[in-house]
């Protein structure tokens, strides 16, 4: 053994181990500082921290100077794609997934020389994109100015001096314009004045794009055309419709296309339509929808199957017809945002002003250029989610700033609401400065912040801003004392004022991330987004260990006395009766909870030490058995110097008995302990070879473990994988999220997931459900499936048949009972009255309204049956039955037009005309005197179409006054020549 080497000497140049470690650490610090200075990400973070400015919402300080026009990405969706292509190309694809991760880095020590260590922390924020129900509130928004012809503008200002000019400008028939009554010209002038105010079609286009997004998932849906009013583009019908309130108008440039008419009607009515189940709610444009066209009208009651291509082409056609193509981009972005709504319960959109559609051909077409293209499913999701995140970040920045500055015990919601309602335009402008993505600039008519309430404020405080912070990396200005300011320009201080660091901790806590405070250095820090990642399960393969025989080798010049800690602590004197307790060494957690060995065996050779093999459930190791060394006893104390895991008993058993044992003699020598601490190169190489062999067998162990897990899951829950397969088949079949949940619930209640193991498509699922319904019925089901596809209709039919009392409507009950129906006609559906024309319930209602039910009218028809047929197949209301009964009482003809609406029927007169010729005894008159009411009705009603042949025959028999002759001349060309009856 070599003698110990001593280091000493006053003023000498010799160095010891401490000096070597100090110089090595100095080199490490230099290399670390050099590498950190060259880090590009850190350099960008420092520059961003210095450029960020703040604005105060209460005083508006800092908000000036940001109203100039700036060219920004994202004004159009194509520019949005270019922005992300430059920043992070796969980000849009990643955030379109239901689950994704946003990775951030928190840089510490950025304004001083960094301390050696981990100065940068990484946080991966998980985002599970679930949707929130949103309701659209309408407000009076700005109107788009229109370009009408010069003569129409003059007519609106100065009156109509020349009717021919009006006919030429509008394209109306000159004879009809000339014959239009003078007392009705005021309505035309008022209509032309209203035309000059403009139009507003954004909300209607938004509903169209919402339908398109739903159709992208469902592929094909059946829509019905009906329950609307048709207005022919002519002077009389246009003015008559203008005089009636509560109407909205939509211009149809393709009157022969039923698909185009179905899309236009759906865009005007409330969203969602009956065929959809959506979380978005948009009110209808008006109570009555009027289709204006220059051709024939669409017959009501027809059905048409729509697909995404037909819907998209109809939206573009309507936008070009009404000169509002400049709103397509804005409407598309708003629809995507509503479809992916996650943060807001209400938003504001402008009220639809559609009077322009009543006279579209009279105006000059403009803005006919189409912008943008149809979005794919994933891209529409990404655009909507980016818009939602931008709104969330802007709202939370102001709400959190106000909440943090409010005094404890006081409700800040009143101040937040007052500020957002009165300064929503300024807040929207400043929100667009948070990012280089100008989506907020592209949707100026969408109100978000002014529609928020207290529940929205509370919800924002429970959401982490890290869900949208990744979009504000190039922000130029943010709210003073807001979370963005604290996260970008943050500081961790040693004083009690830790507002910036507390915001970081709170936002990470809201994201379910636990921050390690000891790793965060004090001083300035900033937060930067790194990347977006797909959510995938992180599978950690278990470590398997294999024991191999290894010969221990130590260096010949090894001297354990150089270790100053080997001698151990000095023995301390204790009072009499006080037992000395051994100092407990640190024990790894795995050793404390290790299971006891199941088998022990010893092996020996002549030239190697003895080995003890210990086997447990997951660990097999071999440790050498060292002969017990001579005990070193002291006269004052017998405490051991060190303890080792190589003793004959396990360390777990040794540590558990430390506190109860008496002072024990030293169990091993210092040389043996240090020999095991310092292994030779040969030993290390053998250990490395053993580790590589263990990695080879790692794959087999992992595969066996996965097989056992799958077997266990299959035994415990057979539906583990079947439910996911059924969900995918339903999605491929065109069903939405809510519809898939309804189908899964129906499957659980009936056939079960296990019964659909061999199914490969939605058709197979439907067939299994049909077989189950025909065999056992759906008695346990109390709700119908949503949607209007062929699969849904068939299943709903079986559900209704199994539960007739639960799902039978009053209309179906009327159709089933017919003459035996005895219900209340006042609350019954009008379109089903023809089934119960002779029932006691219908006759009782007629008698209560003083209408004789059994008299013959309109060609030997009973009054009760005739009224039921007209009300069911026409557009009249039940309240019109009394007037209709008086009008047809005593008549021998049935000339009632089926297209006549309730409003048009209300203008009809019930007068009876006198005979034209005196009565004669030579023959019977061909008509009854009450039949003259059809002439009066044809002349006075605002719509409908009467047969000209019958009207001519009636004109020969009755004396028609001049006012009625003029009206019949304009509408039907009667009384036009010398022979007025030809």
Curated annotation (Swiss-Prot):
Segments of skewed composition (Polar residues): 635-649
Residue ranges, annotated region (Disordered): 592-613, 628-655
One annotated Gene Ontology cellular component of this protein: T=1 icosahedral viral capsid
Keyword Metal-binding listed: no
InterPro entries registered for this protein in UniProt: P2_C_fungal_virus, P2_N_fungal_virus
Compartments in which it is found: Virion
Main location as per UniProt: virion
Tagged with keyword Translocase: no
Keywords: Capsid protein, T=1 icosahedral capsid protein, Virion
Subunit structure: Homomultimer.
Function: Capsid protein self-assembles to form an icosahedral capsid with a T=1 symmetry, about 35-40 nm in diameter.
The protein's name in its UniProt record: Capsid protein
Organism for this UniProt entry: Penicillium chrysogenum virus (isolate Caston/2003) (PcV)
Gene designation per UniProt: p2
């Amino acid at each position: 053994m070599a003698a110990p080497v001593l280091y000493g000497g006053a003023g000498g140049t010799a160095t010891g181990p401490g000096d070597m470690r100090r110089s090595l650490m100095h080199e490490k610090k230099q290399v670390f500082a050099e590498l950190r200075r060259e880090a590009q990400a850190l350099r960008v973070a420092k520059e961003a921290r210095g450029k960020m400015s703040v604005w105060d919402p209460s005083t508006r300080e800092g908000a000036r100077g940001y109203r100039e026009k700036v060219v920004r990405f994202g004004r159009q969706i194509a520019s949005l794609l270019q922005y992300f292509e430059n920043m992070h190309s796969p980000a849009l694809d990643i955030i379109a997934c239901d689950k994704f991760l946003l990775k951030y880095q928190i840089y510490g020590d950025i304004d001083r020389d960094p301390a050696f260590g981990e100065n940068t922390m990484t946080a991966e924020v998980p985002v599970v994109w679930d949707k929130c129900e949103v309701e659209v509130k309408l407000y009076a928004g700005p109107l788009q100015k229109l370009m009408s012809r010069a003569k129409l503008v003059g007519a609106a200002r100065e009156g109509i001096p020349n009717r021919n000019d009006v006919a030429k400008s509008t394209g109306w028939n000159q004879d009809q314009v000339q014959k239009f009554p003078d007392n009705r010209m005021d309505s035309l002038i008022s209509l032309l004045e209203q035309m000059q105010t403009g139009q507003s079609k954004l909300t209607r286009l938004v509903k169209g794009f919402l339908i398109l997004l739903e159709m992208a998932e469902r592929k094909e849906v059946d829509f019905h055309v009906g329950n609307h009013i048709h207005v022919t583009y002519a002077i009389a019908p246009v003015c008559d419709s203008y005089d009636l309130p509560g109407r909205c108008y939509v211009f149809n440039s393709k009157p022969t296309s039923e698909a185009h008419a179905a899309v236009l009607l759906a865009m005007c009515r409330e969203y969602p339509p009956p065929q959809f189940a959506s979380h978005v709610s948009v009110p209808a444009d008006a109570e009555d929808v009027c289709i204006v066209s220059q051709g024939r009208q669409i017959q009501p009651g027809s059905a048409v199957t729509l697909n995404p291509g037909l819907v998209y082409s109809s939206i573009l056609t309507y936008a070009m017809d009404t000169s509002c193509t400049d709103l397509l981009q804005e409407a598309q972005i708003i629809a995507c945002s509503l479809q992916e709504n996650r943060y807001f319960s209400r938003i504001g959109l402008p009220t639809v002003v559609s009077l322009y559609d009543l006279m579209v051909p009279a105006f000059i077409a403009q803005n006919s250029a189409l912008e943008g293209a149809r979005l794919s499913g994933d891209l529409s999701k990404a655009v909507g989610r980016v818009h939602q995140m931008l709104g969330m970040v802007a709202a939370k920045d102001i709400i959190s700033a106000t909440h943090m500055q409010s005094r404890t015990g006081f409700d800040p919601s009143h101040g937040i609401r007052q500020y957002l309602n009165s300064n929503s335009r300024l807040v929207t402008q400043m929100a667009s400065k948070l990012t280089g993505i100008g989506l907020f600039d592209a949707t100026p008519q969408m109100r978000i912040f002014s529609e928020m309430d207290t529940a929205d404020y509370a919800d924002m405080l429970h959401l982490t801003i890290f869900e949208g912070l990744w979009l504000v990396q190039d922000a130029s200005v943010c709210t003073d004392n807001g979370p963005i300011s604290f996260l970008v320009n943050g500081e961790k201080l040693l004083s009690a004022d830790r507002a910036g660091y507390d915001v970081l901790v709170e936002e990470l806590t809201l994201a379910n991330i636990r921050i390690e405070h000891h790793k965060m250095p004090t001083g300035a820090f900033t937060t930067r987004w790194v990347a977006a990642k797909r959510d995938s399960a992180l599978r950690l393969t278990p470590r398997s260990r294999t024991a191999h025989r290894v010969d221990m080798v130590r260096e010949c010049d090894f001297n354990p006395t150089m270790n100053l800690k080997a001698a151990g602590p000095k023995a301390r004197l204790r009072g009499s009766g006080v037992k000395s307790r051994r100092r407990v060494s640190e024990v790894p957690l795995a050793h404390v909870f290790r299971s006891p060995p199941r088998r022990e065996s010893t092996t020996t050779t002549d030239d190697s030490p003895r080995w003890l093999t210990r086997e447990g459930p997951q660990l097999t190791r071999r440790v050498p058995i060292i002969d017990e060394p001579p005990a070193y006893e002291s006269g004052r104390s017998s405490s051991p110097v060190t303890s080792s895991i190589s003793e004959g008993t396990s360390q777990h058993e040794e540590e558990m008995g430390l506190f109860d044992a008496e002072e024990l003699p030293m169990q091993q020598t210092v040389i043996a302990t240090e020999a095991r601490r310092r292994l030779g190169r040969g030993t290390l190489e053998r250990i490395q070879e053993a580790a590589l062999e263990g990695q080879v067998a790692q794959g087999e162990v992992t595969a066996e473990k996965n097989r056992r897990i799958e077997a266990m899951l299959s035994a415990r829950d057979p539906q583990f994988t079947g439910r996911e397969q059924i969900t995918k088949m339903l999605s491929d079949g065109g069903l939405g999220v809510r519809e898939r949940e309804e189908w899964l619930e129906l499957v659980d209640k009936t056939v079960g997931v296990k019964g659909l193991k061999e199914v490969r498509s939605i058709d197979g699922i439907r067939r299994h459900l049909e077989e189950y319904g025909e065999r056992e019925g759906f008695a346990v089901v109390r709700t119908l499936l949503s949607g209007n596809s062929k699969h849904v209709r068939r299943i709903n039919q079986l559900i209704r048949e199994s539960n007739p009392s639960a799902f039978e409507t009053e209309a179906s009950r009327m159709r089933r009972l017919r003459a035996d129906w005895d219900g209340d006609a006042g609350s019954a559906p009008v379109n089903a009255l023809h089934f119960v024309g002779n029932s006691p319930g219908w006759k009782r209602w007629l008698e209560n309204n003083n209408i004789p039910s059994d008299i013959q009218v309109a060609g030997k028809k009973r009054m009760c049956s005739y009224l039921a047929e007209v009300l069911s197949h026409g557009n009249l209301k039940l309240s019109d039955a009394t007037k209709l009964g008086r009008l047809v009482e005593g008549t021998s003809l049935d000339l009632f037009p089926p297209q006549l609406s309730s409003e048009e029927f209300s203008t009809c007169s019930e007068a009876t005309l006198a005979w034209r010729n005196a009565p004669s005894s030579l023959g019977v008159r061909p008509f009854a005197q009450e039949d003259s009411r059809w002439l009066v009705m044809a002349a006075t009603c605002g719509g409908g179409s009467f047969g000209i042949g019958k009207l001519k025959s009636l004109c020969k028999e009755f004396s028609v006054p001049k006012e009625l002759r003029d009206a019949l001349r304009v509408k039907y060309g009667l009384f036009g020549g010398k022979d007025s009856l030809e």
